[in-house]
């Protein structure tokens, strides 16, 4: 197993992609669109619910389309809907290390720090499943999904970061995320929402301690952004097949430009 204690990448611009949920059909549309938009980009930062299980056959679409798009690496900040039954054991074998699961895909530990174009990047994967009541423990739900107190402490101990990547939303989230949480359109049970709120508070504490200029997350299945009074920005990416699932991040300015859905599907 190939591992890495960190990365130091020269890329001036990278792709950032939200939830994918193992959707091979979306991959074979999205990655060619990325190449059409800008064939010079080499890195994808994926924000969790990646959903492709590289311990099983049939996960070739990511490597296949990434190579054709000129993508050399996909760095995954893990989400809640992942194959934790395989991932946890692998992480325990190489604690604190990113490990490679395919030609281009790396799964990042929690937390993990690396650099892109001199920027300090902090990745902290994990989140709560508000649909836990409709899932089966050990089959499609795993307690390992949660961000722990130790993970929070380790993330904070590393000091400030320029860019924070999480799957879970912070408590201080984009208006679109706040509206979703207020309305609870899927009528998730109160106990699940309480765990979710605790996880968001944990992420917020990490953000407030590390003071990233930009915090990007997935999980909420809605695109939106928030520019805080302290000039820190939070961006929520939508899920596969929806607008705002992917875009280009400029490391010099930390400006994010989403790839339009009509450009992806053209």
List the model feature ranges, each with a label.
Residues 16-18, 44-49, 73-81, 107-109, ...:
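Active-site neighborhood of phospho(di)ester-bond hydrolases with catalytic His/Asp-centered motifs
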Residues 61-71, 198-209:
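Catalytic-core regions built around general acid/base machinery
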Residues 2, 7-10, 17, 24-116:
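Core catalytic region of metal-dependent phosphoesterases/phosphodiesterases
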Residues 27, 57-58, 144-145, 195-199:
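A conditional alpha-helix N-cap/helix-loop micro-motif detector
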Residues 8, 115-117, 208, 221-266:
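Binuclear metal-dependent phosphoesterase catalytic core
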Residues 67, 77-192:
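Conserved catalytic scaffold of divalent metal-dependent phosphoesterases
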Residues 21-25, 51-56, 80-88, 113-115, ...:
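Active-site environment of divalent metal-dependent phosphoester hydrolases
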């Amino acid at each position: 197993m190939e591992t890495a204690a960190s990365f130091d990448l020269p890329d001036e611009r990278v792709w950032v992609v939200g939830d994918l949920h193992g959707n091979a059909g979306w991959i074979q549309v999205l990655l060619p669109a990325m190449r059409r938009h800008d064939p010079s980009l080499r890195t994808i930062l994926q924000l969790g619910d990646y959903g492709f299980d590289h311990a099983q056959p049939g996960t070739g679409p990511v490597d296949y389309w990434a190579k054709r798009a000129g993508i050399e690496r996909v760095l995954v900040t893990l989400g809640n809907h992942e194959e934790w039954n395989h991932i946890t054991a692998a992480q325990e074998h190489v604690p604190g290390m990113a490990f490679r699961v395919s030609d281009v895909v790396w799964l990042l530990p929690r937390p993990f720090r690396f650099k892109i174009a001199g920027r300090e990047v902090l990745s902290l994967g994990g989140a709560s499943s508000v649909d836990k009541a409709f899932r089966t423990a050990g089959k499609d739900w795993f307690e390992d999904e949660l961000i722990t107190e130790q993970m929070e402490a380790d993330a904070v101990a590393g000091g400030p970061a320029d860019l924070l990547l999480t799957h879970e939303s912070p408590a201080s989230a984009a208006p679109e995320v706040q509206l979703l949480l207020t309305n609870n359109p899927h009528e998730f049970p109160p106990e699940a929402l309480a765990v979710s709120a605790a996880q968001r508070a944990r992420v917020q504490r990490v953000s407030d301690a590390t003071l990233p200029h930009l915090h990007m997350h997935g999980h909420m299945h809605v695109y939106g952004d928030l520019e805080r009074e302290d000039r820190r920005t939070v961006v929520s990416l939508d899920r596969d097949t929806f607008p705002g699932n992917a875009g280009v991040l400029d490391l010099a300015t930390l400006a994010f430009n989403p790839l339009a859905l009509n450009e992806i599907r053209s």
